[in-house]
């Protein structure tokens, strides 16, 4: 079945699953992302861990698909032959955590010193803005791939810095600012990305009016 992006380019999945290897272990003091797993897969894995333990109910939103061509090899069967990914209108994840509506994006960069705004879209910023106005807990999980560092960064700060672009502001968020204003997450065994610990701090900061 052929899938296409909204710009008409064909979709190809270059990710390959790596078999688990036995033997050599990394240092017990340092944990990195699970080998062969993308950031999205790591978060999905963590969300499942949280759901199974009744800690939170958070899911990845499905990507809308527009079906273009369908074949009917039999009257009771339908086979999708061609489809397009529609442009997403909101963010990657949402759900409920301790009575709070949670909404967030997951982004990664190969940069080492800043996180570029080109990773975001205006519709995502607008969605964050609307959710915050309703009292939602909104943030971005940012990953600096070369550094293997993860952060929960408040959407309120992202929106302010995004808006500042129009008046000559930076086109990226410096790593130093993310370290100062965000919440760093350390990889661990289960869940691999324990981001709810950072969300607790984000909620506490909000209640203090910081």
From Swiss-Prot:
Segments for region (Disordered): 1-34
Site (Transition state stabilizer): 107
GO BP annotation list: chromosome segregation; DNA recombination; DNA repair
GO CC terms, sorted: cytoplasm
Secretion signal, residue range per the UniProt entry: none
Subcellular location: Cytoplasm
Pfam families (alphabetical): RecU
Residues where Mg(2+) binds: 90, 92, 105, 124
InterPro entries: Resolv_RecU, Restrct_endonuc-II-like, tRNA_endonuc-like_dom_sf
Protein EC: 3.1.21.10
Cofactor(s) it depends on: Mg(2+)
Key words of the record: Cytoplasm, DNA damage, DNA recombination, DNA repair, Endonuclease, Hydrolase, Magnesium, Metal-binding, Nuclease
Known catalytic reactions: Endonucleolytic cleavage at a junction such as a reciprocal single-stranded crossover between two homologous DNA duplexes (Holliday junction)
Enzyme class per UniProt: hydrolase
Cofactor binding remark: Binds 1 Mg(2+) ion per subunit.
Sample GO molecular function, one term: nucleic acid binding
Family membership noted in the UniProt record: Belongs to the RecU family.
Chain's role: Endonuclease that resolves Holliday junction intermediates in genetic recombination. Cleaves mobile four-strand junctions by introducing symmetrical nicks in paired strands. Promotes annealing of linear ssDNA with homologous dsDNA. Required for DNA repair, homologous recombination and chromosome segregation.
Protein name, UniProt field: Holliday junction resolvase RecU
Species this chain originates from: Latilactobacillus sakei subsp. sakei (strain 23K)
Gene assigned in the entry: recU
């Amino acid at each position: 079945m052929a899938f296409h992006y909204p710009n008409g380019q064909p979709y190809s999945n270059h990710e390959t699953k790596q078999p688990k290897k036995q033997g050599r272990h990394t240092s017990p003091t340092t944990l990195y992302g699970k080998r062969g797993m993308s950031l999205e897969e790591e978060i999905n894995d963590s969300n499942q861990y949280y759901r199974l333990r009744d800690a939170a109910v958070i899911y990845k939103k499905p990507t809308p698909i527009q079906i273009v061509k369908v074949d009917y090899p039999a009257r009771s069967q339908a086979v999708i032959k061609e489809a397009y990914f529609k442009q997403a209108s909101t963010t990657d994840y949402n759900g409920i955590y301790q009575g709070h509506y949670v909404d967030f994006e997951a982004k990664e960069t190969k940069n080492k010193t800043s996180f570029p705004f080109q990773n975001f879209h205006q519709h995502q910023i607008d969605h964050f803005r609307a959710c915050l106005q309703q009292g939602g807990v909104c943030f971005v999980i940012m990953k600096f791939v070369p550094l293997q560092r993860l952060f929960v960064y408040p959407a309120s700060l992202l929106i302010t810095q995004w808006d500042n672009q129009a008046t000559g502001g930076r086109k990226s968020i410096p790593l130093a600012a993310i370290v100062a204003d965000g919440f760093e997450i350390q990889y661990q065994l289960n869940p691999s990305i324990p981001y709810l610990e950072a969300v607790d701090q984000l909620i506490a900061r909000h209640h203090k009016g910081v």
